[in-house]
Amino acid sequence: MGAQAYQEQIARRASAALGVPGEDPWTVDRAIVRSLRSPLPGNRRLPMSRVATASARSRRLIGRYLYGTGAATHRMNLELPPASHGDVVTLHDIVAWLFPDESAPVAAAAQEARDADAVICVSEFTASEASAFLGVRNPHVIHNGVDERFFDAAPLADDSRRALGVGDRYILHAGGASARKNLEVLAEAWPAVHRERPGLRLVLSGPPHPRRTRLFEGMPGALLVGRVDDALVPGLVASATAVVVPSLYEGFGLPVLEAMAANVPVVAANTSSLPEVAGAAAILVNPTAAGVAEGVITVTSDDSAVAGLVLAGRARAQEFTWERSAREHARVWRSVA
């Protein structure tokens, strides 16, 4: 989810970010590369499974064919082959190398990252991981931004609440269900929260996944709403009593900032990039059942500390804009051209 938002937001702002008064204008061409069988729209088609397993030499040749002779080429995911010059690549995280239930990494990706003219990492944490595990030298750290829709988000309308079944007071977990999301701990923590806050529900949104279903289906006070229409997501966040992010490992943690932008307090694990993104504007907890339960119970108490957390969160989210991120990307693009 975060990687897709990143691609759309940076691509939308690339031309404006590269515009410098008095200098020749840049032309931005966007290649939306899809597999041959993908039903999604795209202006380039490749046999992606074969490209992913191709030799390093073959991938370089494919890159020459795919990108042409631009001054800089920004690969926004590691599946795409490298450019022959001006090669920029983004690392959102290195989970493919660390977690067996994630998609396996492209065989040549680590070497291609080391050979790239520039590597952009979305957090200091990811940059340190890329250096330590992949041997990437001098990565550029450029934080993600927050979609403006979350700053202006109104709570869900009554008909949308009824359609989703979410009610008035709920804790929201939004995103994937891979092992690093730590849903087992959230499932272990929830009964203690439910006993203490019986009027509160746990709402879990995200694409269907057997782990999420196994852990939460039929659990008292828990509700699986599946993949929510994108137009409803800001309202779903804004209507929440709090957002919980118990992950063991995140390359950035965009749901933290989206909640803060929508004036919703956050409980997040004190792991990976989450403290870097949240700053002092979230309740940071150990990623254990006891830690998560205590954090959720605390954030749902009616006291001035929670109100202060909401104000601090809003201010924190305002520091992360896609305009700033795009300008910093443009500096990297110019540096390799």
Predicted feature locations:
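Carbohydrate transferase catalytic cores enriched for Leloir-type hexosyltransferases
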Residues: M1-A337
